[in-house]
Amino acid sequence: MAGVRLSLLKSIQRSIKPHATAKSCSGLLNSHARAFTCGNLLDGPKASPSMISFSSNIRLHNDAKPFNYLGHSSYARAFSSKSDDFGSIVASGVTGSGDGNGNGNDWVEKAKDVLQTSVDAVTETAKKTKDVSDEMIPHVQQFLDSNPYLKDVIVPVSLTMTGTLFAWVVMPRILRRFHTYAMQSSAKLLPVGFSNEDVPYEKSFWGALEDPARYLVTFIAFAQIAAMVAPTTIAAQYFSPTVKGAVILSLVWFLYRWKTNVITRMLSAKSFGGLDREKVLTLDKVSSVGLFAIGLMASAEACGVAVQSILTVGGVGGVATAFAARDILGNVLSGLSMQFSRPFSMGDTIKAGSVEGQVIEMGLTTTSLLNAEKFPVLVPNSLFSSQVIVNKSRAQWRAIASKIPLQIDDLDMIPQISNEIKEMLRSNTKVFLGKEAPHCYLSRVEKSFAELTIGCNLIRMGKEELYNTQQEVLLEAVKIIKKHGVSLGTTWDNSTL
């Protein structure tokens, strides 16, 4: 049926004039489309109401593709099966609508069109701006050349003062807006449940940048004004190194402020323990020294000083200096190593070789201890790199061991005494039972006495409490021995007296 209609349309198209072909053909096609979608088809089911209402709005123009949204694949195939131009036009208008990915392709094409339009608009605006500036620059240059005072004094001073006012009034507000936007963006990027602590502006990256940037702009502005006011007093060759040095110092100042803010926030966090806090403090000191050294060398290079040559020449003499001061350098390196490894901290009781005491100060070259007699002892840091360090304060438990001599005549009662002493130790709340069980056994038998050894682990406690607990354990053990009628012995051999 569709083929018959196509034949009729083609015969009518041949009979009309060429200049009216497009218009008449469009009208016939519109009529044919309405007839096709009205639902009175002889070779197919009745069309849906949505298709009828949609197809009734179709209008074909002489420059548009017919049946662009008809959406009937069989009709498209009937027209596209012919080899003439008209059938190819109809097929090209229908083929895209029958594809399920048409909407996605349309959106991609629209996005490309919008992007291309934006690029063209920006390019055109830039071109027009460049043309206007090219036209205005000669006139402005001619005006400034005719007014030397305006060109040499008023305009530079005005621009300099404007930049200074911008740095002191407008820039802090812009930096605060950047800080607010950064905090909001970080909150959006962080996953749900992740702790997001609000950082105040004064302790943020932007807060650390504010003062160095303001003072740098102000310094450059006044240096520029001074060079204009007194060009003979301030030589031109000194202006560029001065500005470079100011930029370097401002950068070092900014890095130091930012580093201080970050470390302060880290130390204020509750998740940092004692050892981590000490490491962060050490990192703070080392980074400060490094920033100072880098800033000093960069400033010297900016001022024309050949730092590399100085370091090369100084390296030769540095070898001899290193041999002469190897003890000092050894103490310094050992101090830096201890700052990072942290074998002990302030307040710990340590023992290194023959030195024992409580740590009261840790320096870069020496460490101060307080010995048992409460005398301060100054120990070189190089000693700790060659000795075994025992840190008593970090022990999770303390072991005690005591030996009690008994009379040799009471050996039969020792097994019963040992069992009762072990039960007494197990029932003590200050005895640590996690690693080793308390023990009490006969460790030595001599001619005149027998020796009973008592040992256990105590929980972590202070020195005074440790001594009191040890005394309590010994007194309880003596009570058990006395209860069984056993007398304490002596380790001296009376036969030799």
Swiss-Prot record:
A single MF term (Gene Ontology): mechanosensitive monoatomic ion channel activity
Membrane topology per record: Multi-pass membrane protein
Keyword Transit peptide applies: yes
Annotated coiled-coil segments of the chain: none
GO BP: cellular response to oxidative stress
Family in the record: Belongs to the MscS (TC 1.A.23) family.
Name under which the protein is recorded: Mechanosensitive ion channel protein 1, mitochondrial
Organism: Arabidopsis thaliana
Organism placement in taxonomy: Eukaryota, Viridiplantae, Streptophyta, Embryophyta, Tracheophyta
Gene behind this protein: MSL1
